Regions:
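Glycine-rich N-terminal segment of FAD-binding domains in flavoprotein oxidoreductases
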Residues: 26-28
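Active-site microenvironments in enzyme catalytic cores
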Residues: 1-24, 34, 40-307, 319
Length: 334
């Protein structure tokens, strides 16, 4: 229970507590935690409480906090819950709550590397039918390992940032040669993005059993896609300018600790992956290869056009990072 006046079903109750970076007029960006319809200025609260690690909350991104690793993340969450449930801390917390209407949200993470995965069988099949109508929609390797490509971390922006329609080469089917101009087939992809915290050393890639130690949290992600540019450029090395002009992410990062109760088993995989990618979870979704009981709703000009369920993903986030070396602040799309 919390002393905060929050409805039991509020999406930003004490069981969530996502992190973000915010500012108020005349102040520098700093770390905050969403609590109900307010943002808790964590740095100010931590300083008043005499926390030695308070400096990480005054930074303009979550990167310094991400670098501290799983033990520090869990300890910080426990401290936050204590602040919000114990009346002893009420005065300090209330003094450092800011209405969400009074803040500007910023990109929560300085993104080090970015990989966009192709983990949904339904999506991969549909895209394959569009781009390769005369071939099998799934390539032979798709069910054997997670497919991804390195995107452009420098064009990841916080949700609400204006997106400029890209220009590039495209080859209309009725034209003998390509033409240059603005994309006429601008598309969206509703995804979850995963934020990596603890880094690995070069040459020591992530193992499946350790993946949870590196995954810090989840954001909503829109993978903007210029389909006409993409279709012309992607052979043989994959997407480039058609997928690298903008990727929008939500300002709030929901931690993997907060999503423990949302873990569910993956759908069956056939053929079974090689052992280094295979970890069969229990019925409660335990293990490292798990799905999430989360759905995304896509509303297009007032009409809901899609409600994809993340639990239906063929590849989960943990196997997707296996074999990679990663830096804190790295991210991936689903």
């Amino acid at each position: 229970m919390t002393w905060l006046d929050l409805p039991a079903d509020h999406p930003y109750g004490i069981h969530n507590l996502p992190y973000g970076v915010f500012s108020t007029p005349g102040t520098e960006p700093r770390v905050g935690v969403r609590v109900g319809d307010h943002v808790l200025d964590v740095g100010a609260c931590a300083q008043q409480a005499g926390m030695e690690s308070g400096a990480v909350w005054l930074a303009p991104s979550l990167n310094a906090f991400l670098a501290e690793g799983r033990q520090a993340w869990s300890a910080a969450r426990a401290w936050l819950v204590e602040q919000l449930t114990n009346e002893v801390h009420r005065e300090c917390v209330e003094a450092n709550l800011v209405s969400v209407d009074e803040v500007t949200m910023h990109l929560p993470v300085e993104v080090a590397d970015y990989v966009d995965f192709y983990a949904s069988e339904h999506h991969a099949t549909n895209v394959g039918r569009i781009f390769r109508p005369d071939s099998e929609p799934l390539t032979p390797n798709w069910k054997h390992l997670p497919i991804g490509y390195h995107g452009r971390s420098g064009t990841i922006v916080v949700s609400g940032t204006d997106v400029v329609r890209p220009s590039g080469q495209r080859k209309p089917p009725t034209e003998p040669v390509p033409v240059f101009g603005p994309s006429v087939r601008l598309d969206i992809e509703a995804e979850l993005g995963f934020v990596v915290g603890a880094a690995t050393r070069l040459g020591e890639p992530v193992a499946l059993a350790d993946a949870d130690e590196h995954l810090f949290g989840v954001v909503l992600l829109n993978d903007w896609s210029a389909r006409d540019l993409q279709a012309w450029e992607y052979v043989p090395l994959g997407p480039f300018l058609g997928k690298s002009f903008a990727t929008s992410i939500s300002p709030w990062v929901v931690t993997t600790d907060a999503l423990q109760a949302a873990r569910v088993p993956l759908p069956g995989q056939d053929p079974e992956p090689l052992p280094y990618l295979h970890d069969q979870p229990t019925d409660d979704g335990a293990g490292t290869a798990y799905g999430l009981d989360v759905h995304v709703e896509v509303d297009w000009n007032g009409t809901v056009v899609s409600r994809p369920e993340f639990r239906d993903m063929y590849w989960s986030p943990a196997p997707s990072w296996v074999g990679s070396s990663c830096r804190y602040g790295s991210g991936s799309g689903s």
